[in-house]
Amino acid sequence: MIEFENYTGSESLHIAGFQVFKDEEIKESISLFSTDLKWVSRLSHHNDIFRTKLGDIKQIQNLDFGVLNRLLAKLIDAEEFEVLNNQYFCKPPNYKMTSAHQDNAYFDSDDNVFTFWIPLQDVDLLNSCMFYVPGSHVVGLLPHKIIGTNVRTRTGKTGFSLYSDWYNNSEFVKVPMKKGEILVHDKNTMHFSSPNLSDDYRIAITCIMKVTKWKY
């Protein structure tokens, strides 16, 4: 079994390609999302809900996080930005890992795109935390393979996930987090999340943002 090193937080987003932030104002805002999955579900259209093969809600796309998006933009010094997608992820108990990939493999953009990943509970190796290859964002977009894993509710259409085996597992570091912390990564940073081996759902929200104007 591989022993992954822990993220130390000593390197910046620019150097490592990812960074964990703590912000009390954002912590209050995201607490609104941590109470009731059904409440969040009502904010979405049925076509935006993906389910696992067992029928569990896996993710909900195209949510409106409003104020939260503006608060997150401040963390990376974005003066103007465009929200590409907001998602709500609900990883069921005893559910598989999310394979290693770069977010940019999904949209292949030359723009400055960042993903904010915000757990709604403490996360660690047991209940599925994130893993990154530090500095991998500077390499650019790498080859990926398509894996069909998601089923969109009502339409029955299968979505797809992408996988890359470019890096060895030993090159990843694990990033355990506390509820209220915010993780941001570059569009080209290689990452995956471990299986949820706990008996509870692991819930997180993501905000994918394109910076159109920096403060500096």
Task: Label each region the model flagged.
Residues 1-102, 106-109:
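Non-heme Fe(II)-dependent double-stranded beta-helix
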Residues 1-8, 34-44, 67, 145-147, ...:
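Non-heme Fe(II)/2-oxoglutarate
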Residues 18, 111-117, 127, 172-174, ...:
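Extracellular structured ligand-interaction cores
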Residues 23, 102, 120, 186-187:
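Residues immediately flanking
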Residues 95, 111-113, 182:
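Coil-to-beta-strand transition motifs
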Residues 101-113, 177, 200:
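A short beta-loop-beta micro-motif enriched in histidine and acidic residues
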Residues 108-125, 208-212:
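Short, conserved beta-strand element in jelly-roll/cupin
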Residues 125-190, 214:
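Double-stranded beta-helix
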